[in-house]
A protein has these predicted regions:
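N-terminal, intrinsically disordered, polar/charged segments of Gram-positive cell-envelope systems
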Residues: 27-111
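Alpha-helical transmembrane segments
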Residues: 14-18
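N-terminal post-signal-peptidase region of extra-cytosolic proteins
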Residues: 111-127
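C-terminal motif of bacterial Sec signal peptides marking the signal peptidase cleavage site
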Residues: 19-23
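Domain-level detector of nuclease and nuclease-like folds
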Residues: 120-123, 131-299
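Bacterial N-terminal signal peptides that target proteins for export
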Residues: 2-11
Length: 299
């Protein structure tokens, strides 16, 4: 009887953990009516696995279940490779070499920039590009320490904005580290180009802002590599008086309003900075309909 109770307890624990996670296993498609949970179709398989696990441990001398046995998904702050692969699947063919870095982003072209030679002199400049649908698609810049902005946005008149880019269907109070679905995601970051005369570094510049997940925009650690992490490398280089060629591209599929990913490249004149990466526009606690930005909470 004790063994039976132990098995039933294990089964209940597994079902409680597995069912909520099932809805987080895939990204939404680009079709506006296809944003859906996978919970219903996953229950039979999950129940079978849980029952098998309970039966296996019926003769065990311990009732404890560790994390390795449960194989719980999405316990890291960055999206899993499976989650990210789902988001970028339609754009993978645009890259000859793409490798997941184990911390949320992808290495492009063996991490080698394609920006060409960088001269160790000249004035900084920055420019944006939009497509025929008005979507922010790319930002190019030549950066020096002169371009760096050290003051905060409120001090330079570039504070919070009520303007929203296409697909910006915000969701608040999400579980986990990243509590919002979206940020106003910049192509060229304020701290990098905010001191270039004539460049609009505000959060309401439609040429420089697109809908980006909070994770993709803000993650900034070596083991959690969102856009801010790579911008940090460039900020440090500029603070050391280096000259950096910099490019950021938002990559869309068809007429979708929300980009699937952001490609970031940087190269310094002395060669100490040279990277080429792809940051997927996804997040652990949401599913995204890239066609219109609709969000479904999945944890």
């Amino acid at each position: 009887m004790k063994k039976l109770k132990r098995s039933l307890s294990l089964l209940a624990a597994l079902l409680l953990l597995a069912v909520p996670l099932a809805g987080c296993s895939t990204e939404s498609t680009s079709q506006s009516n296809n944003s859906q949970s996978t919970n219903g179709s996953s229950k039979p398989a999950l129940f079978s696995k849980a029952q098998s696990f309970a039966n296996k441990h019926d003769n065990s001398t311990s009732s404890q279940v560790n994390n390795d046995q449960l194989k719980q998904a999405d316990i890291t702050p960055y999206p899993s490779q499976a989650r990210s692969d789902q988001a970028i699947e339609p754009i993978k063919g645009q890259f000859n070499s793409l490798q997941f870095n184990g911390s949320g982003a992808y290495i492009v072209n063996n991490n080698q920039s394609t920006l060409g030679d960088v001269k160790p002199y000249g004035r900084p400049w920055a420019q944006n590009h939009q497509d025929s649908q008005g979507r922010a698609t790319s930002g190019d810049a030549y950066l020096t320490k002169q371009a760096r902005q050290y003051r905060n946005r409120s001090q330079t008149g570039n504070g919070a904005s009520s303007w929203k880019p296409a697909g910006y269907q915000q969701v608040f109070n999400l579980p986990g580290q990243y509590r919002f679905a979206y940020n106003r995601g910049h192509l060229l970051g304020y701290a990098l180009v905010g001191n270039i005369n004539g460049f609009n570094a505000s959060e309401s510049n439609p040429q420089n802002i697109a809908t980006q997940t909070m994770w993709a925009n803000q993650a900034q650690k070596p083991n959690n590599t969102g856009q801010n992490y790579y911008e940090g490398i460039v900020r440090k280089a500029l603070d050391q008086n280096k000259f950096v060629r910099y490019q950021v591209k938002d990559i869309y599929v068809g007429n979708e309003q929300v980009p699937r990913a952001t490609q970031i490249q940087a190269k310094s004149s002395d060669g100490t900075v040279n990277f080429n990466v792809l940051v997927p526009n996804t997040q652990n606690n949401i599913l995204i309909n890239y066609a219109n930005g609709q969000v479904t909470q999945c944890q």
